[in-house]
Amino acid sequence: MTTSELPEHLAKHEVRYADHRQVERDRLTPMMQHYAEVKDQHLQQILLYRMGDFFECFFQDAIVVARELELVLTSKEAGKEVGRVPMAGIPYHALDRYASQLVEKGYAIAICDQVETAAQAQGPLVRREITRIITPGTILEEGMLQARRNNFLAAVVIAGEHWGLAYADSSTGDYWTSQSTGLEGLTQELYRLQPSEVLFPSAAPDLAGLLRPGQSKPQQIPDCLPDSFCYALRSPMPFELHEARQRLLEHFQLRSLEGCGCEQLPLAIRAAGGLLDYLGETQRESLAPLQKPRTYSLSEFLILDQQTRRNLEITQTQRDGSFHGSLLWALDRTMTSMGGRLLRRWLLQPLLNPEAIRNRQAAIQELCQDGRLRQDLRSLLQKIYDLERLSGRAGAGTANARDLLALAESLLRLPELAQLLSRAQSPLLAQLQQVPPELEQLGDRLQQHLVESPPLQLTEGGLIRSGVAIALDELRQQVESDRQWIASLEASERTATGINSLKVGYSKTFGYFISLSRSKADQVPDHYIRRQTLTNEERFITPDLKERESRILNAQTDLNQLEYDLFVGLRSEVSHHVETIRAIATAVAAADVLAALAEVAVYQNYCCPEIRDDRQLAIQDGRHPVVEQALPSGFYVPNSCGLGSDRGPDLIVLTGPNASGKSCYLRQVGLIQLLAQIGSFVPAKNAQVGICDRIFTRVGAVDDLATGQSTFMVEMNETANILNHATARSLVLLDEIGRGTATFDGLSIAWAVAEYLAREIQARTIFATHYHELNELSGLLKNVANFQVTVKELPDRIVFLHQVQPGGADRSYGIEAARLAGLPSEVIDRAREVMSRIEKHSRIAVGLRRGNGSQRRTQASPQQIDATIATEQLGLFSGPSH
């Protein structure tokens, strides 16, 4: 940053330097010299430098912080020859609030804190050190995290078409690795995880700071990695296989990574080791305890690509990205933050293993049938705090006394939880029937040591109960005795001096004092020593008062230090139990999710789907889980669906009017399949669900302005992805393929796509369309059936019945939809006239039927039909008749 880039208002401060690198160090004050030395080591982070009650920023960082946080940008003297330099500051007690804003904007922050008091300082400066670096993916502070979603840090290693991925949430201890082939799979995993920060090894000589979302990526980052994430380029050395493996073995005290499942996965090891190195560098002494890395394969879970997650509105709505109206919104009845995070993960990573699915179903079934157990469980869960993050902060050494009390209260609820679930039969609930006794003992110890309402600050006393430590009680008794002496001093001095207005007071600057009005100053005894003169007041001390003050202050300092030491001991004790606490927390979170899904199932009248090993999808009276909750009770019209059985079709051509509910029906089927594979009950009267390997959706499209792609090109890219990756075990939901181009081109593409899905792939497919000519496919291919969303025609209007029935529609009623939208009557009348002419002259359906009755694989091409009717198109849009 040059001098010319200084904000104009700093000119009045005669500020000349905007960058600390512009200034010769020996011209700076000692404090500023130290600041510059620290900043040299952290050029890529914003440096927050503790000065008393504030964290200050200087030079270029001050300008950035003032701009991003909308703070006052002022200046500070940095040396006689340097003059004033830019400065901005935030109160130390508001660090979390301001730091979270900077992190959300994609900045990394280096915290340079005071590690000794002014009284402890040996030289002219209080010692300051970098205590931790906060980046988007390494946040531990409660106030900077979203309670009900994970904050993942990811690391990626790519070798050709092969890739390794590691991700961790340092606040909860989750640590996972994977390795696979095909960069598309890596892209989709990152979209699923939504990491706050992605690490990528680079040999570039200048490793820039964080690349914020939307910034142009350097050439070192492959195009397959989405622009919507925050990236940190890292030195390749920590990602080298030998170094990464050794770091993992040493950190987790292992002889082999076989137990972690990644011993034979070199790219996964490299990613995991590089991630661990970054956490150690940024968190310093506050490195949160991580679980041993666990390895998973993409083939273990149903694959949902980003397009499908968006179209099915799993965690946010498609229209405005809000939580309200999403599937997660409709299902989330969890009582704990841990449960909320786990439910989100279950929804984004459905299972393929039928046995695992049935285990979840069994627990939900039991909780549905035993309403008393379900309600008691949910009431008890409501009293349990976030065990994962509380124990994580304790392990990292950042937990305060209130954190430990919340942890203690939660641990003491566990025996009650075990007793409640003692009669549970399902394996997932039964795993909470035994709670390690040491956790209850730890909870008791914490409650016995900590006061009921401790302060947030840890160094100002008031943390530990009386009776815990003899030395602590003796110090408190001494301080209390001296304070009582001071409290009685005012009365005794009034009697001794005869001055009834005499008062005893205290200030942080001058300590204890005797206060008199200036009019009484000539009446003070000889042993009073003047300490301060104010406008209307004189302040004095006495030798005895000075001695007592010194005793109180020294004893209070010792008292505060002793309380802090006792607290740190308690916190350290908790850190030794983090692994056990988190194991229990995992089971508690699962019980919470299962109870929440049971609650939804009971109140929304869901059924338990039969999980099948074949391809059958049979839904009787299915409902959309979100839409039905948004409507008054009983208003939602249920619909059935049958796909993939010996008697049923593989592909349904779904026709019907605009706004009749076709898209809702598609999403309904997709969500029921997804819910079944997370082990949930589903909104239907009855359901038989065959395991699905992928769900594909193409519902609506818009221009992609960022890549210069039109609506039609976006649609074709999405369709190509489906045709290239779908299998016979996939579920494909397509809406309006081919509508983004000319009518006959669109019909040609729609016909060919539907035919390919039914004949070649034989994926279970619902193909919603306004091309009624596609109804002819059912006469050509045995595994295609026609269904329509019905309407009731009245003399002056139509009524949407929202019922899906066998048969193909021959009208779309688009003009009726336009009329309902409020188009002028002249436009509606003209549209009807043009429609009449088009219907009279069209030969498309006739041409398509030429193939009917012949071999299944032959039919007239839509291009031939185009040529046949080309001449008939002339004159269709001549002026209206009079």
UniProtKB/Swiss-Prot annotation:
List, in alphabetical order, the Gene Ontology terms for molecular function in this entry.
ATP binding; ATP-dependent DNA damage sensor activity; damaged DNA binding; mismatched DNA binding
Entry-linked Pfam families: MutS_I, MutS_II, MutS_III, MutS_IV, MutS_V
Q: Which residues bind ATP?
A: 656-663
Query: What keywords sit in the KW lines?
Result: ATP-binding, DNA damage, DNA repair, DNA-binding, Nucleotide-binding
The cross-references to HAMAP family, in alphabetical order and at most eight, read: MutS
Record family assignment: Belongs to the DNA mismatch repair MutS family.
What does this gene product do? This protein is involved in the repair of mismatches in DNA. It is possible that it carries out the mismatch recognition step. This protein has a weak ATPase activity.
Q: What is this protein called?
A: DNA mismatch repair protein MutS
Annotated organism of origin: Synechococcus elongatus (strain ATCC 33912 / PCC 7942 / FACHB-805) (Anacystis nidulans R2)
Which lineage is the organism of this entry classified under, starting from the top rank?
Answer: Bacteria, Bacillati, Cyanobacteriota, Cyanophyceae, Synechococcales
